[in-house]
Amino acid sequence: MSGNTFGTLFAVTNFGESHGPAIGCVIDGCPPGMPLSEADIQTDLDRRRPGSSRHVTQRNEPDAVEILSGIYQGQTTGTPIALLIRNTDQRSKDYSRSAESFRPGHADYSYWRKYGIRDPRGGGRSSARLTAPTVAAGAVAKKWLALQYGTRFRACMTQLGELPIPFEHWDHVRNNPFFAPVADVAQYEQYIDALRKAGDSCGARIRVQATGMPVGLGEPLYDKLDADIAYALMGLNAVKGVEIGAGFASVAQRGTVHGDTMTPQGFRSNYAGGVLGGISTGQDLELSIAIKPTSSILSPSASIDIHGHSIEVSTKGRHDPCVGIRATPIAEALLALVVMDHALRHRAQCADVVLPLPPIPAAPA
């Protein structure tokens, strides 16, 4: 396959390019009978929308979603759901000099070597613009999981460049443009303003969480839940690392600490991040992703053109000084898509499993 479809039973096919007429996706496998409207999807799209603050790209796309199929009388029918988002604010002239040059850190060179042709306008198919359909599909998955299991998804930024962001409360995340769990974001605004003025960019660390998780999701050996989570999140533009639970901090832990001990009252900790043996435990899914600095910067960089000549590249156009800012709702969506797919797979195989012991409560947050 050509890598444009994600999922097994809840399958999402993504289509479009950054500067094409439209982008979108087709969802196949959504259970019938779920109430669904464009408003259910638009809320999450508005959270990742470009032009939403002065700290992100000023490409001003409304990202208004259109449901083309799969809905009748306000409910899913069980047939493919086609979602369309029209591109309305392309500025292709900004990329007129990019057709024969390779921007360092971008997919220009690798796409050209693979296909022998590439769309230089805004990165074409490799653009983060293509995460909008992912967020739209994730909103559908989120709604079904919330109705079926009470599962909720949330994410926040925990580091901006070299600045760690302390966790204060989840309520702060929706009240600032950084999706930061703090009340005061003045220092982060100053940091981004200085980066933009210097023609530079930075990376970010994003924490992602799913609460109200059902037990038993995951298909060993090769479709483990945590393996599929890592696979999905590594598919997000600019992600260079995924941690689940304690992640790399596990190296310095002792077994007496890392093992999530259990009592009749519940788990005492969640260093595993809600997954054991590739199967969900019912504890919260806890993970973090590392996002590299934005490759599109005003500062000149050495590169070559398609003829092999040395050139200097300075990227024009409208770009995010930190793509991690808008990655938060995208990471939520990808996690929701993985959980949704595994929930349907688990229900198909193990719906009749009955045990005498109820699920063990999760450790206190």
Swiss-Prot record:
Cellular component GO terms held in the UniProt record: cytosol
Catalytic function, reaction form: 5-O-(1-carboxyvinyl)-3-phosphoshikimate = chorismate + phosphate
Binding, FMN: R125, S126, S127, N237, A238, G277, K292, P293, T294, S295, S296, R318
Keyword Amino-acid biosynthesis appears in the UniProt entry: yes
Free-text comment on the cofactor: Reduced FMN (FMNH(2)).
Keywords annotated in UniProt: Amino-acid biosynthesis, Aromatic amino acid biosynthesis, FAD, Flavoprotein, FMN, Lyase, NADP
Pathway: Metabolic intermediate biosynthesis; chorismate biosynthesis; chorismate from D-erythrose 4-phosphate and phosphoenolpyruvate: step 7/7
Cofactor requirements of the protein: FMNH2
EC number, UniProt record: 4.2.3.5
Domain of life: Bacteria
GO biological process: amino acid biosynthetic process; aromatic amino acid family biosynthetic process; chorismate biosynthetic process
Pfam families attached to this UniProt entry: Chorismate_synt
Binding-site residues, NADP(+): R48, R54
A single MF term (Gene Ontology): FMN binding
Subunit comment: Homotetramer.
Family: Belongs to the chorismate synthase family.
Known role: This reaction introduces a second double bond into the aromatic ring system.
Name the UniProt record assigns to this protein: Chorismate synthase
Protein species of origin: Verminephrobacter eiseniae (strain EF01-2)
Taxonomic lineage of the native organism: Bacteria, Pseudomonadati, Pseudomonadota, Betaproteobacteria, Burkholderiales
